[in-house]
Amino acid sequence: MSISMQTKPARWKTLVAFAIIYFVWGATFFAIRVGVREVPPLLFCAMRFVAAGLLVYLWATARKEQQPTARQWLSAFLLAFLIFVVDYGFLFWAEQRVPSGIAAVILATIPAFMALSEIVILGTQRLTARLSVALLAGIAGVAVLMSRSIDLGKLGKLGGAPIDTAGAVGLIIGAISWSIASALARKLPLPASKVMSSGAQMLAGGAMLLAVSAARGEWHGFHLLAVSGTAWIALVYLVFAGSIAGFTAYVWLLHHESPTKVGTYAYVNPVVAVVIGYFLGGEPLGARTVLGGFFVLASVVTITSMRAKTPAVAEDAE
């Protein structure tokens, strides 16, 4: 049934749902930053998604949703590797090196890489002049963020300390990995229920993250009792607000609003993350950050306005 044929929900419900995917998801980047100050990054990431995945999976089971088949579990593990191990793994790791607001801006390039995936992998998108300009704007934005200084001629230079190169590259790899997963999800067998599919993927991702964390030796010398209440609050926020409430609001909005309108979270989240990082985390907010962020967000706005398809992957767990 089309969105226009459905009974429109109460306006306040729509506003609350948008507030969740705009502001709750935007604040998750700062919560990650808080957590990885005390907990090893991949272990903290694993704790989040094991907990969230288990709760979502049990929720889907309680609703009598059909259990994933063996093939669907294999698909879930493949997507979970790309989304949770690579994308989120690099995000949590990078936030030890890169301000949370900058991390959010760099990850806002995901729509650009998704567009490239649709061109290269799916063949459902053409490289038009408008898309080319949008992609170049996104690249320029990241280049500005990573540069040491920018000579503006008579206007002077945009200087300041550059962001950590390894952290920035890790975030870009994560964005590319997410875009590949989004393209593959349209071809892989997955549970019909978005709730069950998301729960399975988060569980699979959390399990793999635990294994990678252990292999990297993150557990050695780490003691849960030494973790402060602030870090635990950050974890609870990520599980219940970021993953569960955010996912619920996102799926609900997809049933009541156009995908293009719902997709606007992609360029609101970075702004929220930068503001929160500046005011609560004391993160730098210079002219170069504003300029680079402007280019990235201009790219995101252009690309998301061109794409009106419902995502096949639960974009889900912010």
Where are these regions (language model features)?
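Hydrophobic transmembrane alpha-helices of multi-pass small-molecule transport proteins
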Residues: 56, 109, 117, 129-150, ...
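C-terminal-most transmembrane helix of multi-pass membrane proteins
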Residues: 2-7, 49-50, 58-60, 148, ...
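Juxtamembrane C-cap of transmembrane helices in multi-pass membrane transport proteins
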Residues: 28-39, 51, 88-98, 106, ...
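Hydrophobic/aromatic residues within transmembrane alpha-helices
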Residues: 35, 44, 48, 94, ...
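Hydrophobic alpha-helical transmembrane segments of multi-pass integral membrane proteins
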Residues: 13-17, 43-58, 78, 131-144, ...
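Specific transmembrane alpha-helical segments of multi-pass solute transporters/efflux pumps
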Residues: 24, 28-29, 55-107, 143-144, ...
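Membrane-interface helix termini and inter-helical loops of multi-pass transporters
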Residues: 30-38, 93-96, 146-163, 216-230, ...
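Specific alpha-helical transmembrane segments that line the substrate/conduction pathway
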Residues: 43-54, 83, 88-130, 135, ...
